[in-house]
Amino acid sequence: MAFSDYKNISQTQREFGIAYREERFLFAAPVLPPQSFLADLEFNLANMDIFTSKASRTELVISPLLREAYKRFYERYAFWIQKPLNYSEKLSGIPDYLIATKSALGKTVLETPLVVVVEAKKNDFEQGWGQCLAELIAAQKLNDNPSLPVFGIVTDGELWKFGKLIGAEFVLETTGYTLTDLPELFGVLLHILETAD
């Protein structure tokens, strides 16, 4: 089964025996992104209809924001866009984004996956989380360390939701963040990358 075949959290839970709970677990100080990033984002928001298509959300909001957060941690992590992640026939596919520990062998080798990001197609967060949880399970199994948290993000570019898988329990962060709360959102992204490994 491809990751995208999982349509909601409960389907993925039942398939793999994962418990579920909701909790506020992300506490991060707001951080303002660099001025150059803010200028580009403000230009895009003012002059382009960035939320009309998946491609525009990807290229003008999601990728730039993830890349900006990643820049502060590039010595520790590798940042992948549509890198295949295959554990088994039931857990395989291509995550939209993946952040993993950096390999001593270079940027072409995938090491320990720590963060997976799923774009909520057509703003469907229910399906996005079903897919994301399957990707988190695959990442956890590839890591061969169930006690190491693996973080998931589902976003449509405007709303960003967070979760984590530890052992056989998935925890959904109760607070969502939007572009209008950019310092809070950016602070949470940095906090996840700071604590991921």
Residue ranges and their predicted role:
Residues 2-4, 16-21, 26-149, 161-197:
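A short, conserved, highly charged catalytic patch centered on acidic carboxylates
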Residues 151-159:
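An amphipathic alpha-helical core segment
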